[in-house]
Amino acid sequence: MKTKNFRDMTDEELLKEIDGFKTELFNLRFQLATGQLDNPARIREVRKGIARGKTILRERELKINRA
């Protein structure tokens, strides 16, 4: 998901999205451990999504405006 999409979300929506990413990451790691993971690159994408979401939330806390 693009950063612009995160910026368009409300804080509640952003928290739900981050929670969804965390659940997905848990499932992906479980699949990796059991050898059932089809796309290992997805783990990286999900981790970056979590980081982007948390960064946007923190910027809002500090009232930092980014383009």
Swiss-Prot record:
Sequence similarity: Belongs to the universal ribosomal protein uL29 family.
HAMAP family tied to this protein: Ribosomal_uL29 (MF_00374)
Protein source organism: Desulfitobacterium hafniense (strain DSM 10664 / DCB-2)
Protein name in the entry: Large ribosomal subunit protein uL29
SUPFAM superfamilies documented for this protein: Ribosomal protein L29 (L29p)
Single Gene Ontology BP annotation: translation
Gene: rpmC
PANTHER family, per the entry: 60S RIBOSOMAL PROTEIN L35/50S RIBOSOMAL PROTEIN L29 (PTHR10916), LARGE RIBOSOMAL SUBUNIT PROTEIN UL29C (PTHR10916:SF0)
Record carries keyword Ribosomal protein: yes
Gene Ontology molecular functions: structural constituent of ribosome
Keywords recorded for this protein, A-Z: Ribonucleoprotein, Ribosomal protein
Cellular component terms per the entry's GO annotation: cytosolic large ribosomal subunit
